[in-house]
Amino acid sequence: MSDPSSKNSSLRSNFSPPPQGEGKKPLAAITPSNIAPLATDGFGSAMEIAARCNTLAELKAALEAFDGSQLKKLAHSTVFADGSPASRIMLIGEAPGHDEDKAGLPFVGRAGKLLDRMMAAIGLDRSTFYITNVMPWRPPDNRNPDPGEVAMCIPFLRRHIELAQPKLLILLGAVSARHVLGLNDGIMKLRGRWLEYRIGTEMIPVLPTLHPAYLLRQPAHKKLAWRDLQAAADKMEAFGLPAKE
């Protein structure tokens, strides 16, 4: 991929990539097994509703009207997505925080600002990628969602991926990696490794990496995220992305 502009170079500097001498380690490629989410009372209903949605607009409306989640009743807004739906690069985070719940958009707080700098470092912005979360509703007090709450959202997330038709997925954090891929490995074991996600008969390359909120708490690990972004940039260049279809 071509070098970012001088503006992006400044943003890349703010993201603090590691010294050039560190280089990149080879990335392992594995294919995850499919693990069904936990069954809950409303899971079948969520599957039926999600399956009937034929466009992203219909899916958004279905989520906003869905009454099978206690989290939705406690949240201020349904946080659906941001960025360009036409992009073939899709990012998936974990759940909205306070700022996202208030704005109705994903990644608008401090973690979102760091994410924008991270993506700018490889020449992307929200006009050239698409972003959503596993959970469209904020758990109270930013607590971790319980397995049943996550399971209720999985049919909508899977349909979201199918309708967005990405050519490359970047998973931000452990919750996203675990529930998109059906793997129980920790994010430190998964990050930087190319995996695959099936959409119909097509296998989509997937790269888990560290969540920006984690990087705010552990800035020394930004160098690991930078290696992952370099790997993503290489894959995008090979695929001719971020071309829109």
Predicted features and spans:
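A polyanion-binding, active-site-adjacent surface
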Residues: 1-15, 24-245
